[in-house]
């Protein structure tokens, strides 16, 4: 197994249930420090090649960095490599049984997609999820610039960033769409919310409402596993810390509809809320319908997101076009649905 940490733990849990044992663990050369993981000394890839004549590599972490992805693809050229598709926010695995159970919905979504590129990417993603073969991911990759310039219509006057992290996507949207004059941003992680507001305090000429909230379908207090941004999810059993050090605490949630009064705006909404996309959409219905709305929706946090969220969105916005794009990442993260007029 290549990699350690939370991703490896999740894969090992599935392997244990299947009665499959990991023979050894290895890390990138610069990260081999003589330490152990799950009772085994962590080796380098060179040591693995010296120890085993034939072996299968399971990739247990992800990256969008070009040099790291090049390393993944390089190892895949040397030996058999798979990147298991585990849901980021838990739940069912996207295995053959799950696919067959939901095949009718999967096929309906394919028919709804607006262009052939979207359908090719959709096919590649399903093939990857069922096989773990990362060559499908490389074939599906497109640059985000194409979507932001050529798929979305632009000219937005307002922007809602649900899952605003440290302000990176807010900064990106203002660069692509300088006509934006009103922004609502949700970010529940305290550490990254501080970074977000440090950035928004520097933005001039734009009315920004930053909310230290989880995007949800109602006003509610929930248990939050605070992974400091990207890994912050609703859920947890008790307040404290996880074994990986994430804080588990109470947090306030609210609907986007309760935090803005947008009407008649050319509005872009981004949903990247770590598995709460369905509820966040439910909490946005007034806002969506009161404005000329386009959306960017993440489809990779739960196994069913790839088909359940497009079906929900089509029901809400039947006249909008649905474009699917996957931006460079291994495993199948950064999958976005672009919902356009």
Predicted regions and their residues:
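Phosphate/nucleotide-binding beta-alpha loop and adjacent structural elements of enzyme active sites
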Residues: 2, 6-18, 22-23, 28-341
């Amino acid at each position: 197994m290549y990699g350690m940490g939370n991703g490896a733990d999740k894969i090992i849990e599935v392997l244990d249930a299947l009665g499959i044992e990991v023979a050894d663990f290895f890390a990138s050369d610069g990260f081999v420090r003589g330490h152990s993981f799950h009772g085994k000394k962590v080796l380098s890839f060179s040591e693995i090649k010296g120890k085993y004549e034939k072996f299968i590599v399971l990739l247990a972490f992800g990256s969008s960095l070009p040099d790291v992805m090049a390393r993944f693809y390089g190892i895949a050229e040397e030996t058999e490599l798979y990147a298991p598709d585990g849901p980021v926010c838990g739940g069912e695995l996207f295995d053959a049984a799950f696919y067959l159970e939901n095949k009718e919905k999967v096929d309906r979504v394919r028919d709804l997609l607006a262009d052939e590129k979207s359908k090719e990417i959709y096919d590649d993603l399903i093939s990857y999820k069922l096989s773990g073969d990362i060559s499908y991911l490389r074939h599906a990759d497109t640059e985000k610039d194409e979507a932001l310039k050529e798929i979305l219509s632009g000219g937005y006057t307002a922007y809602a960033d649900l899952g605003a992290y440290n302000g990176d996507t807010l900064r990106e949207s203002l660069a692509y769409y300088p006509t934006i004059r009103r922004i609502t941003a949700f970010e529940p992680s305290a550490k990254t919310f501080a970074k977000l507001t440090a950035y928004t305090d520097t933005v001039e000429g734009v009315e920004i409402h930053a909310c230290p909230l989880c995007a949800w379908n109602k006003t509610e207090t929930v248990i939050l596993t605070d992974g400091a941004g990207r890994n912050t999810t609703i859920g947890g059993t008790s307040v404290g810390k996880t074994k990986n050090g994430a804080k588990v605490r109470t947090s306030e949630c609210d609907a986007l509809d309760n935090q803005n009064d947008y009407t008649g705006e050319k509005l872009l909404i981004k949903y990247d809320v770590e598995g709460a996309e369905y509820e966040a959409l439910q909490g946005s219905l007034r806002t969506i319908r009161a404005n000329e709305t386009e959306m960017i929706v993440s489809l990779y946090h739960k196994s069913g997101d790839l088909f359940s969220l497009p079906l929900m969105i089509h029901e809400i916005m039947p006249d909008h076009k649905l474009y699917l794009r996957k931006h460079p990442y291994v495993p199948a993260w950064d999958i976005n649905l672009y919902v356009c007029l």
